[in-house]
Every structure is written in structure tokens, then in C-alpha cells.
């Protein structure tokens, strides 16, 4: 497998890795490119998300646009936010200026009718008919609610236990909700834990941890460091990737199905890198940013790892040392590498979108 650089597009703000649509700024003007058609905009879109046959376009001002192809179907003037990609609803919110508390709701984008009877001070995750509300820092809990916002159950993050090694006295919180599998709600936490709750009762079903602070806690199944966790729909697995290796967890049983250490499995491939950043699951592969201790002036290298073959497929220094030194341009961990069909997409710190084509 090999990729060659096809093009570079400067001043890109938002882009959709599923089909390559993007927004950009040039000479003080803003543009949105959908299906190869350039649309002039009053402000530049910050986020593009392909959901089914529609493109969701979101602006920093809170404005939202719904497109089919390059045709505008619906526009909402403000106070919107994108929800998780498992839903086609659009999030809405209002800020209480007296308390600086944000209240959330959601609606179908066509009719804008709120689903919840009242907006609530909880972030929302919606999948099918399940509504999950959570507050990491005030209420410090997760709950399932109905359309009337009544709690069907609640789970306090205090019950996850403290980390008495790295962050004593602090309460754990959600980093990512991975999804619902066989009536299990899976999420990863700030303290390096992976938790599954019964979506009907809110009771803990599985708890895994790679945190040394949990080694003596009988309620946790010990695994190697979890790193970044992703749900893989194809085989109902959770893939956890760190700089040391990866682990595959059966999301239906909570069992560790696979475990791999990069230095042992692929020492001359991915194992030769000193640092692995921004792993991004893409089916049976994951992409990453890489760095050696001898590298200078930031990150310039990316790679693709085959989870089944357990080996590095491709790597490239897409921003060479000379360019990084001369321009201070480099890659950033907040912008991972995406695979879409036969193309690769990644943005650098100067908002240039690099597009690669597979040979």
C-alpha cells in the first residue's frame, strides 16, 4: 500500500473526512465546498458531518444548515450544536446569563420541534430511542431520561472510585460515550477506565481499567493501558489503542479478545517510533501521528497500521524536517489522519488540508 500527495488546500476550517467536502477562507471571504460546488457564505462553517444522505453544516455562531448534495434543505439561525454521529437529530441549547448554566435539548432538523419537554443542564447522547444525559462537572453523574426529562435511572461518577495516585480527591468523568451494544452503554473515562452500564437499569455490568490506582480494586478487571477507545460496529468490539499497543474487547461480554504490544509484534514497523499520537480507528486499520526522539520542530509523520496483520502498512513524513524548521508548520494531535475510500485527509497547524491518493 502506498499513497502519494494529491493536493494541498490552504485556510481550511472544517472538512468532512467521509467524502472530502470542506470549508475555507480566502482574502477575507468564506466558502463551503459541497459535491465540488463552491458556495459563498457570510461566515465560514466550522464543522461538517455526513449523516445518511444529508450533510450537517455547523457554524461557531450556533447557526446550522442541512444540505442534500449541494442544495440547502433547512437552516436554523442559532443556538444549535452537533450531537453524536449515531443520530440524525440536531442539538439545541440556551445559556442562562444569570447562572451561566447551559440548558440542552434536541430536535429533528426539518421541523425544529424540541423532543424534550424542557431543556436540561446536561449534555445529551441520543441513540435510537435511548436518551442519555450527563454532567461531568456540576452534577457529576450520568442518567437515562425520557421525553419528559424524568430520570429512569442515574449513576454517580463518585461510584467509579477515586484515583489516589495521579489525581487524589478528584472525581472521574466521561471522556467519550462509545455507544450502546446489546443493551450495554459503554463509555471511557478520564482516569483510564472503560465502563459498561445496563441501559435499562443503570447498574454496572463491566468495569475495566489500565490505571495503577485500580490494581487492588476487585470491581475492576485489569488490562494494559487503554489509551484511546473506539467502538467497531462490524464485530461489536471496542478497540483501545495506546502508544504501547492495542487491545480488542468484546463489547457484548466485556472479555479481552486480543492484545498486542507494538515492540513485540512489529518492532521494525510501528514499534520503532518513540511516540504515537492521535490514533484513529478506521475499520480494520488505525491511523496515527508519529515522532522519534531525534525529531525536531514538531510532528511531521503519519502512518497506517493493520490491526489484523498486526503490522505497519504505510508511513510518510508529510511535513519534512526542512519545512518544519523553516516555517514552524507541523501536525497537531487534535487533527488525526482520516481514510476515506482511496484517499487520506489531514490538517496541519496552519490549517492546510493535505489530501493523498492511493496508488
Enumerate the predicted regions with their spans.
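Surface-exposed loop/turn elements that mediate protein-protein interactions on large endomembrane-trafficking
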Residues: 1-8, 28-43, 61-77, 92-116, ...
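Repeated scaffold domains used in trafficking and secretory/extracellular systems
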Residues: 6-19, 41-54, 75-87, 91-92, ...
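Conserved beta-propeller blade signature
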Residues: 23, 56, 89, 131-132, ...
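Short, solvent-exposed loop/turn segments at conserved positions within beta-propeller repeat blades
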Residues: 135-138, 187-190, 240-241, 294-299
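Loop-centered beta-sheet repeat module
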Residues: 175-195
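Long amphipathic alpha-helical segments with strong coiled-coil/leucine-zipper propensity
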Residues: 231, 238-242
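Loop/turn-rich, solvent-exposed surfaces of beta-rich toroidal or solenoidal domains
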Residues: 243, 269-307
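Polyanionic, low-complexity segments and short acidic motifs
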Residues: 346-347, 351
Amino acid at each position: 500500500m502506498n499513497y502519494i500527495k494529491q493536493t494541498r488546500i490552504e485556510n481550511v476550517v472544517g472538512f468532512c473526512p467521509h467524502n472530502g467536502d470542506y470549508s475555507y477562507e480566502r482574502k477575507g471571504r468564506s466558502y463551503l465546498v459541497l459535491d465540488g460546488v463552491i458556495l459563498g457564505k457570510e461566515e465560514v462553517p466550522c464543522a461538517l458531518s455526513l449523516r445518511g444522505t444529508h450533510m450537517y453544516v455547523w457554524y461557531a455562531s450556533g447557526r446550522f444548515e442541512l444540505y442534500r448534495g449541494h442544495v440547502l434543505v433547512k437552516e436554523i439561525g442559532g443556538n444549535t450544536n452537533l450531537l453524536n454521529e449515531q443520530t440524525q437529530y440536531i442539538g439545541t441549547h440556551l445559556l442562562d446569563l444569570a447562572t451561566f448554566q447551559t440548558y440542552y435539548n434536541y430536535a429533528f432538523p426539518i421541523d425544529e420541534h424540541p423532543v424534550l419537554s424542557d431543556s436540561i443542564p446536561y449534555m445529551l447522547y441520543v441513540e435510537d430511542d435511548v436518551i442519555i444525559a450527563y454532567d461531568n462537572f456540576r452534577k457529576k453523574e450520568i442518567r437515562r431520561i425520557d421525553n419528559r426529562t424524568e430520570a429512569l435511572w442515574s449513576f454517580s461518577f463518585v461510584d467509579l472510585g477515586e484515583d489516589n495516585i495521579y489525581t487524589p480527591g478528584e472525581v472521574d468523568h466521561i471522556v467519550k460515550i462509545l455507544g450502546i451494544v446489546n443493551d450495554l452503554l459503554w463509555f471511557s473515562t478520564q482516569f483510564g477506565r472503560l465502563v459498561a452500564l445496563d441501559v435499562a437499569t443503570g447498574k454496572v455490568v463491566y468495569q475495566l481499567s489500565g490505571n495503577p490506582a485500580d490494581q487492588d480494586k476487585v470491581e475492576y478487571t485489569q488490562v494494559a493501558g487503554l489509551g484511546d477507545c473506539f467502538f467497531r460496529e462490524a464485530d461489536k468490539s471496542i478497540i483501545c489503542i495506546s502508544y504501547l499497543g492495542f487491545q480488542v474487547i468484546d463489547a457484548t461480554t466485556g472479555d479481552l479478545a486480543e492484545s498486542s504490544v507494538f515492540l513485540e509484534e512489529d518492532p521494525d514497523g510501528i514499534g520503532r517510533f518513540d511516540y504515537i499520537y492521535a490514533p484513529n480507528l478506521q475499520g480494520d486499520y488505525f491511523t496515527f501521528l508519529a515522532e522519534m526522539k531525534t525529531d525536531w520542530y514538531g510532528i511531521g509523520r503519519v502512518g497506517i497500521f493493520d490491526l489484523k496483520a498486526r503490522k505497519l502498512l504505510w508511513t510518510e513524513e508529510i511535513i519534512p524536517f526542512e519545512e518544519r524548521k523553516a516555517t514552524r508548520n507541523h501536525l497537531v494531535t487534535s487533527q488525526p489522519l482520516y481514510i476515506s475510500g482511496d484517499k487520506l485527509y489531514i490538517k496541519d497547524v496552519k490549517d492546510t488540508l493535505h489530501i493523498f491518493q492511493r496508488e
